[in-house]
């Protein structure tokens, strides 16, 4: 059989694991901001701070996770350990109604599991292809889109469980999903024998005071404890600063050690893509915070006599990603003609443009709410769907470029740095942006009145901010296109 005729068989086990990881992560994420404000009665500012701290630290730990996978564990073992930790974290989160301390501990455990899982699952997928394999981009688009099956089901299932039963039941479903994904992945273990395994030589060398696996176990226990303190003391911003400095230092070291100009050029492209990804996700991550509270407070959620739980709206974005992702992976064929860098920047411009359009629709929705008291459901659905479509032109493109780099032994670390900037820093910025909507007053009875004008202003500013990014990216695209054209003309002459 032609090796380029179809996707590798192992990809379907990775996709299955990704589906259930998305179910687990996004099921919990859909509930978290609502849990903090509606159940624990945090004010908006406090809720945004904890939510953005959690989402930021979730993307800090992939640097350590990528390092452990590159040097010790291998991508396969790192992914399995990460999935197990996330399942444990969701179980503990379900008990946070018993005592508030469980909230911080559970978020810390999930953060550690996510760090081992997130960057390394992409690298594991990259190991299934040769660097020049044309199926690579399609494989990443397929994984990204298929993973959103879990994102679609999770807010519906977890939102329904929370609404009809309890918050603990909603969070418990997220844990069940992660365990299911891990079991399926283990069933396909034989298809990953050619991927990198545990580096036993390194393990044997780390036996000072403790046996081989001792230090790894200490790390798995000590890291959640440390992150729990960061949440409790609200020191996460300091951890973010330290992680960013370390990440940029590692990136500079990789750049200096690059063997030729081609490798340095690839690194510069990755850095620039990461910057615009960071801005994109600072806008997109409003979906789990300010947009979620906007829907809860200002959108008419009645449909055929049933009030749709707010958490279920998180499925709209994922549904758009899945449908459009399958279309891009299997219907739209990637052209091998032309310059790859030019195509990359064209996709980024389209993604940022769609994000701007999505927030333009949300601005109209908020203005509708200001005039009539509540916004219409179809307008909200359209805005979230457009924003979901935009995602397909950002992360899959950047991740594919990272795994394509020809510097050995750095893909895990580079992916971790990408997650740090486009995830951790972006989520911190998203929290700062979301906090601009936390304007409220109290009436004579003591009830809280939330300001719709704050949402209008923030959504409108994001619309124009994303549009400005499109302008810059289009200039880069034009520069690269002209450069490629001039080079082609020079070769012809």
Curated annotation (Swiss-Prot):
GO molecular function: dipeptide transmembrane transporter activity; peptide:proton symporter activity
Transmembrane segments annotated in the record for this chain: 14-34, 49-69, 78-98, 101-121, 138-158, 167-187, 212-232, 235-255, 269-289, 312-332, 344-364, 379-399, 413-433, 462-482
Membrane topology: Multi-pass membrane protein
Organism superkingdom: Bacteria
Periplasmic-side positions: 35-48, 99-100, 159-166, 233-234, 290-311, 365-378, 434-461
Protein location: Cell inner membrane
HAMAP family in alphabetical order: PTR2_DtpD_subfam
Family: Belongs to the major facilitator superfamily. Proton-dependent oligopeptide transporter (POT/PTR) (TC 2.A.17) family. DtpD subfamily.
Entry function: Probable proton-dependent permease that transports dipeptides.
Protein name per UniProt: Dipeptide permease D
Native species: Escherichia coli O157:H7
Lineage: Bacteria, Pseudomonadati, Pseudomonadota, Gammaproteobacteria, Enterobacterales
Gene: dtpD
